[in-house]
């Protein structure tokens, strides 16, 4: 087959399902605790037994509206719930309560920083079609999984059924797998900052379905849309998109049909595979739920909830760059997790310099956090203590080397760096007379090196600095040591 000259345009949209972090389910008081024994968090409402009526959890509405506001969506003053009819083992009622034609919020956007390897980082505005509330389905556990070792059949766990979801539907504004992954990551970041969801993809708290098609040019009609499921990481989203783009282009260029279907991402084989044909909205036979009244959100309530929104990641990134002088990279890393950003700001407020605070937090502290599976708000080493250590480095009381030496104990136990330095006798030697005496001894001990230095081999200054640090166990003030060494060696 000859190589095609067609420059295909990729069109991607994401449906992001965010489990809202309420203690009880969307229409009942049943618990939402993750990881408990199967089918222990169900009740007559979850199962849709005769005589039961759903009642909307008010916290779900609050979380959904706050999420919508953070995504710049317009909040509907009036919306409703609908029944989505379909038969599947994980749906105990044989219908799902969702929102169809009158969602809680529509027409929003977010800006996403896209960093592709080997390319310059750029910012892209991604439109968001809508956000609607719905209940989650149960979870099928299939034969051969870790949970059903040795089993030859599948079972269903209804603990997840009825958990509150906010489904966020993007507009088809994404053009690469990387853009799709960055968009999903930013949505999760926002949800975590708001505190409406933990966004844990491994536990299913955030799940993304990708809708993807290709067309020859931007002026052509959209191609046949394919939905991809079963991606539990941002890298999986990117890889699934990249594989599917190649698959569809190859099919079109070979004269084959691209079917409208749902496909699964196979992480092991790194490919998508057909799951089922894709249903249209008419197949679900939506109609208003007769057991649930309309949802009214007053202007007063909207303003109250808007006033409670925290500073969001994009605003923080901008502030860190413009006001604190941090690089775009540092600002991006620091704001990835709200607990890291909060820790950083507390250190700066305690007097730590912004750049050095960022370096220590994104370096040594972040590595410790990751290896010990902690968050920054679980650290024993308090922001005020890190600020104290940074000020000791700035004033020359300790060197960076000594700071790294005491850091492991501070991270594991916390405490005053100043006190720890005193207890260990690690304070810097800042007395010029003491340093001069040690340098005089070094000059007497290394006459050949002194002669070579004075003959023009200026690189030997590093040798003497090393010897001085060895003698003082790294405690000599580096700036003062260099000044005195230069003076003595030039004599």
From Swiss-Prot:
| Gene3D superfamilies tied to this protein | 1.10.10.410, GatB domain, N-terminal subdomain (1.10.150.380)
InterPro entries (UniProt xref)? Asn/Gln-tRNA_amidoTrfase_suB/E, Asn/Gln-tRNA_Trfase_suB/E_cat, Asn/Gln_amidotransferase, Asn/Gln_tRNA_amidoTrase-B-like, GatB, GatB_C_1, GatB_Yqey_C_2, Gln-tRNA_amidoTrfase_suB_CS
Which GO terms fall under molecular function for this chain's record? asparaginyl-tRNA synthase (glutamine-hydrolyzing) activity; ATP binding; glutaminyl-tRNA synthase (glutamine-hydrolyzing) activity
Keywords attached to this entry: ATP-binding, Ligase, Nucleotide-binding, Protein biosynthesis
**Enzyme Commission number(s) of this protein:** 6.3.5.-
Tell me, what is an example of a GO biological process annotation in this record? Answer: glutaminyl-tRNAGln biosynthesis via transamidation
Q: Name one Pfam family in it.
A: GatB_N
According to UniProt, the reaction catalysed is: L-glutamyl-tRNA(Gln) + L-glutamine + ATP + H2O = L-glutaminyl-tRNA(Gln) + L-glutamate + ADP + phosphate + H(+); L-aspartyl-tRNA(Asn) + L-glutamine + ATP + H2O = L-asparaginyl-tRNA(Asn) + L-glutamate + ADP + phosphate + 2 H(+)
Which SUPFAM superfamilies does the record associate with it? GatB/YqeY motif, Glutamine synthetase/guanido kinase
The record's function comment reads: Allows the formation of correctly charged Asn-tRNA(Asn) or Gln-tRNA(Gln) through the transamidation of misacylated Asp-tRNA(Asn) or Glu-tRNA(Gln) in organisms which lack either or both of asparaginyl-tRNA or glutaminyl-tRNA synthetases. The reaction takes place in the presence of glutamine and ATP through an activated phospho-Asp-tRNA(Asn) or phospho-Glu-tRNA(Gln).
Q: Which NCBIfam families match?
A: gatB, PRK05477.1-2, PRK05477.1-4
Similarity remark: Belongs to the GatB/GatE family. GatB subfamily.
Give the record's subunit note. Heterotrimer of A, B and C subunits.
What is the name of this protein? Answer: Aspartyl/glutamyl-tRNA(Asn/Gln) amidotransferase subunit B
Biological classification of the source: Bacteria, Bacillati, Cyanobacteriota, Cyanophyceae, Synechococcales
